[in-house]
Amino acid sequence: DRSSAENFPAKLSTEASQPVGSYFANWIMGSAPKELSSATSEDVIIRTTFDPQIQQVVEKSTRKVFEEFVKEDSKAEVAVVVMSKDGLVRAMLGGRDFSGGVDKFNRAVQALRQPGSAFKPFIYAAALDQGYSPNTVFFDEPIEIEIAGSKTYKPKNYTGEYLGPVTLNDALGKSINTVAVKLANEIGIEKIRAIAKDFGIRSSIGKGPAIALGASEVNLLELTAA
C-alpha cells in the first residue's frame, strides 16, 4: 500500500550509482514523477537516451584537461551536456567529482550562469522573425543607451574595434556586441524574451539591454537544448 511504499522509496540500482553517468541518472530520477521517485518500492525500468561510450569519452577528456591545465588546489568546476541533433541527451557531467553521488550538486542542470555571446543567436532569430534579412545592414559604432533610474549603458566590442557598416550575417559571425545591442533595442526586449522561451529557455530572462550580450543567467541543459 501507499504507506508501505513511502517507507521504502525507490532508489537507484547499484549500476546507476556507479561513477559513469551518475549525474545523468540523478537528473533522470529528479525528473521522474513524484509518485515514482518517492512513493514506490516496485522495481521500475526507465529507458533513457544515455550513451555510456560517449559518457566515458566526456569523463576521460575532462579528467585529462584538469590534470594537465588546472592546479590541484583550484576551485574550478565543470559542466558538460552532450546532446545529439535530434535533441536527446546522450551524456552529462555536473562537476569535477565524477562519482556524482545522489546528493551532489549537478552544475549541468542546477547552476545558473551568464551565457554571454551564446545568447546572441536568440537576438538574431527574433530579428528574422520580425522580417529582418541576414543582409540587413547595421552600423558598428560606439553606442549609449539611456536606462531610466540607472547608469547609461555603454556596451563595447571585445576587440575594442568598430567596423562601420556590417550585415547581420557578419555581425553574428564576428560576435559584434554593439550590433547585437542595437538590434535588440530596435526589435524590443519582450520579443527576444518570448523567442528564447519558445526555444526552451525556462530560466528568468531580464528586461534590460544587457540581455543581448547574455547577461541573464540560464542553465547549461536548457541552453544546449535550445
Residue map of PLM features:
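Stable alpha-helical elements in mature extracytoplasmic
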Residues: 1, 24, 28, 32, ...
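Periplasmic/cell-envelope proteins involved in peptidoglycan metabolism and beta-lactam response
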Residues: 1-20, 37-121, 125, 130-136, ...
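Ca2+-coordinating acidic residues in Ca2+-binding motifs
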Residues: 4, 122, 142, 222-225
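Active-site-proximal helix/loop microenvironment
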Residues: 8-10, 199-225
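Conserved catalytic neighborhood of penicillin-recognizing serine enzymes
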Residues: 13-20, 24, 30, 132-192
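Short, conserved catalytic or adaptor-binding loops enriched in Gly and charged residues
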Residues: 31-39, 203
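Flexible glycine/proline-enriched surface loops and loop-helix/loop-strand junctions
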Residues: 39-43, 103-109, 153-155, 163-165, ...
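Generic beta-strand/beta-sheet core signal
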Residues: 81-83, 90-96, 135-141, 169, ...
